Amino acid sequence: MITPPKNPALGFTLLEILVALIIFGLMSVISFRGLSSVAQSRAHLAQENRKWSEVALLFARLEQDLSMLANRPVRDAANLNAAPLVAKSILQSESDTQLSFTRMGLPDQGNVLAAPTRCGYRLQGERVEQLIWPATDAAPRTIPTVNLLMENVAAVEFTYLDSTGTWHSRWPLPDSDMVFPAAVQMVLDLKSGERITRLFALPALQ
């Protein structure tokens, strides 16, 4: 009769090894999914931060431009007199804008104001653009500088408040002596589904 050794050699059975491999594989999958979820969350957060930063910068740019309104009539590309602030809902040319106005020049390094310029805003495709003309009186072939302010925008709507508290989609108003509206409202519809409304009170320059 053979007596088994008192201290048998220690080791893992094949079944134990397979169970350990399965557990290790499951833990690896869970860890990978967790890291992937964290990476996706970070990317989404960065995209959201960038989107809202662009919205804030767009509103800040328009607010700055509107705060520098100048009551100076201009001549348009057709050599016709145009009001200091012009608003339309339908664009008719490549350089046309939904909102355009005369803006005081910015100060240079010597704190001397530059000459007034013509400034405009529009939605072109899915892009909100600012247009700057080199002179207030536009020659027929004057090409404005186009600055991209924001992308992925579904719609932009401007409305204008008169002295009676009525909102209008165009400016100037027929049979009215109001040069500027009391306020401008901008409604921004983003491709991601949000709608943002911002009201800009205008300086009293009538």
Placement of each model-derived feature along the sequence:
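A short, structured loop/turn motif at beta-sheet edges
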Residues: 94, 122-127, 148-157, 191
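Short aromatic-glycine motifs in intrinsically disordered, low-complexity regions
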Residues: 135-148
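Short histidine-centered beta-strand/loop micro-motifs
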Residues: 109-113, 140-142, 169-170
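Short linear sequence signals and composition-biased patches located at protein termini or domain-edge surfaces
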Residues: 152-206
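Juxtamembrane/interfacial segments around transmembrane helices
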Residues: 65-75, 148-149, 198-205
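Extracytoplasmic beta-strand-rich oligomerization domains located immediately C-terminal to a leader/signal peptide
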Residues: 30-136
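N-terminal single-pass transmembrane signal-anchor helix
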Residues: 1-2, 7-35
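Short, surface-exposed coil-to-beta transition loops
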Residues: 114-118, 143-144, 181, 197
